A protein has these predicted regions:
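GHKL/Bergerat-fold ATPase module
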Residues: 1-13, 22-51, 55, 63-66, ...
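A generic alpha-to-beta junction signature in SAM-dependent methyltransferases
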Residues: 69-72, 114
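Conserved ATPase-coupling elements of RecA-like P-loop NTPase cores
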Residues: 72-73, 106
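A conserved short beta-strand within the histidine kinase catalytic ATPase domain
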Residues: 74-83
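Flexible ATP-lid and adjacent glycine-rich G1/G2 motifs of the Bergerat
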Residues: 92-165
Length: 346
């Protein structure tokens, strides 16, 4: 199921449980009525995929997985399996997770920029705005998401063909060398997640550059990912070089122990966390999505030795909000805070 060829398209006339045909029809109609709308969608998708979210593939996959587990009320387990290219099949990254399965609201969210279905998930949810999934476009032109036998996929080739049939888009397509906002045009898919998981995101690699980026991001997985996403209990990174497992658990005294099979010993993290409600006037000039979650939280985390003395963290020296931003942090600790961000997580 984690190979690209295991994701299939239902035969014509079969049920379309996520109403992808309706979503495509609405988008194509809007593009036909206004080439400016097509241009707006294309620019927005490119900005996210090639700009702010280009290097956030693993973080966004983990964040979506953690939020799905939060919705289901279960601990999140995430397995990232990388298959090398074989014969005529491209290299593939498969991200399988436990948690709430794919539903129609999630499909619409994935296919609609800045229209997240997570607004009612409560303060434990991390995802915002519905833009994070665009990170998959940094490495793949054929992403798919399936759970419990049904799913959704996207295809640049098929999206290009659909857009070519829309009157009035010929000039735009030529100007963009045939690139179209493919996430706006979902297609039905069939398949299932590996045993013991609920959902899998399948990403056939576009080219060698995509493979290199994915390998670098997989190698960069560290303790900060599990500390930033408290419901993320386990991450397994399975590549041709071997299998690496990271887990987190709370131990006596409230410290968090992160065990990494690639490390010589576990790391014990001491956390101090504060949080509360935000006064409405502090959010008056913030986007609606933020005003619907009027809470704040701040956590400092420091690795400690057996005698309790602090050590310098080996995590990236940047502010986490709660996942990494590009804001540098010059203090020898890990900062996780609900700071306001723009859509590119700056």
């Amino acid at each position: 199921v984690t190979r690209a060829g295991a994701i299939s398209t239902p035969a014509e006339g079969h049920p379309d449980p996520f109403r992808t045909a309706e979503l495509r029809r609405a988008v194509l109609t809007a593009w036909g009525a206004s080439a400016a709308r097509f241009r707006e969608d294309a620019n927005a998708e490119e900005d996210l995929a090639l700009g702010g979210h280009r290097d956030r593939l693993i973080i966004e996959l983990a964040q979506n997985a953690a939020d799905a587990a939060t919705r289901a009320g279960v601990p999140c387990r995430l397995r990232l399996t990388y298959h090398e290219a074989a014969d005529d099949a491209p290299a593939v990254l498969a991200a399988a997770n436990t948690g709430a399965p794919l539903d129609a609201a999630a499909v619409e969210s994935l296919s609609t920029l800045r229209a997240s279905a997570k607004r009612d998930d409560g303060p434990a949810a991390v995802g915002r705005f519905g833009v994070g999934f665009a990170a998959v476009l940094a490495v793949s032109d054929e992403p798919a998401v399936v759970s419990h036998g049904r799913g959704v996929r996207w295809s640049l080739t098929e999206a290009r063909a659909m857009a070519a049939e829309v009157p009035g888009l010929a000039d735009e397509l030529r100007r963009r060398d045939g690139h179209v906002p493919l996430l706006r045009l979902p297609l039905p898919a069939e398949g299932g997640a590996p045993d013991a998981y609920d959902t899998v995101v399948v990403l056939p690699m576009r080219d060698g550059a995509a493979q290199d980026l994915t390998a670098r991001l997989l190698a960069a997985v560290d303790d900060a990912l599990l500390l930033a996403l408290p419901n993320l209990a386990e991450v397994v990174v399975d590549t041709p070089a071997g299998v690496r497992t990271l887990t987190r658990r709370t131990v006596e005294g409230g410290d968090v122990l992160v065990e990494d099979s690639a490390a010589a010993a576990p790391t014990r993290w001491r956390l101090v966390t504060e949080g509360g409600a935000l006064a409405p006037e502090l959010l008056a000039d913030r986007p609606v999505e933020e005003r619907l979650r009027p809470v704040w939280s701040v956590a400092w985390a420091v690795p400690v030795a057996a005698d309790g003395s602090p050590a310098a963290p080996r995590t990236a020296p940047v502010v986490h909000a709660p996942t990494p931003t590009d804001e540098p942090l010059g203090l020898p600790a890990l900062l996780l805070a609900s700071l306001p961000l723009d859509p590119t997580r700056r």
